[in-house]
Regions:
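Acidic/glycine-enriched connector segments
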Residues: 2-198, 203
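Basic, amphipathic N-terminal segments
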Residues: 218-240
């Protein structure tokens, strides 16, 4: 029987990984718009998965608010992705934001890895901002569902997009008000304040090609670290 010197066996190579985050409108979407955005989000997730090996670690980060957040959460879970849910408050407090859809929130939370920001209602905007920035710091591409003009103040979609652009996190911009192809925002210079669609940002087929190249580049880097729990991010939430 052949023998092997186990002292010469190195550690297994890390699995390739990719993380998709979300920021976007919380308003109610009509069925046609919701269907279109769900399709566009699914196309991005499928593009990522098709570009990486079958053993890749695929993660979606969503705070699970009504609207955009849940579109990504549902699409990711339907494809077998791991869902991470950074929450601005403890779930019992956060549920007050959407009294009509608490059951849908709980259903998603039960299938996610929840993380809680150490925030409270007395500093709600700071907590929303912290959750949004956590998503940006821990994703490889950020989906932004935004109409291009609404300003939500601190922690809103426009502010989180600016934060992502400054951090050079690619933004996959989907417009809920127009059936246009996605725009890929690649750098801070392509966004002004308030953010607006740059004329030179790739869209449609060109954006998808650049996305595939972006995903492929992750194969040459170390695996993504676990979510950053430093700073405002607190403990792992369980048992709800």
């Amino acid at each position: 029987m052949a023998t092997h010197d186990v002292s010469t066996i190195g550690p297994a190579p890390p699995l390739p990984a990719f993380r998709v985050g979300i920021t976007g409108t919380r308003r109610a979407l009509d069925p046609a718009t919701q269907e279109r955005l769900t399709l566009q989000i699914g196309e991005l997730l499928d593009c990522v998965a098709a570009t990486l090996p079958g053993n890749a670690s695929l993660r979606a980060l969503s705070p699970l608010a009504e609207g955009a957040d849940r579109l990504l959460a549902e699409a990711a879970l339907a494809r077998g992705w791991h869902l991470v849910a950074p929450l601005p408050f403890p779930p019992k407090d956060y549920k007050a934001d959407f009294p009509a859809t608490q059951e849908a929130f709980q259903s998603l939370l039960d299938r996610a890895e929840p993380l809680i920001v150490d925030g409270g209602r007395d500093s709600a905007n700071a907590s929303y901002e912290a959750a949004g920035r956590f998503v940006v710091r821990n994703c490889d591409v950020l989906i932004a569902i935004w109409d291009g003009h609404t300003k939500n103040g601190r922690g809103g979609t426009a502010e989180i997009m600016r934060f992502a652009a400054r951090a050079e996190v690619p933004i996959w911009w989907l417009n809920p008000d127009a059936p246009t192809p996605p725009l890929l925002i690649r750098r801070s210079a392509e966004l002004a304040y308030p953010p607006h669609a740059p004329t030179d940002a790739p869209s449609g087929i060109k954006a998808e090609a650049e996305l595939r190249a972006l995903v492929a580049r992750t194969l040459t880097r170390p695996a993504a670290p676990p979510p950053d729990r430093a700073g405002l991010i607190g403990h792992l939430v369980s048992g709800f």
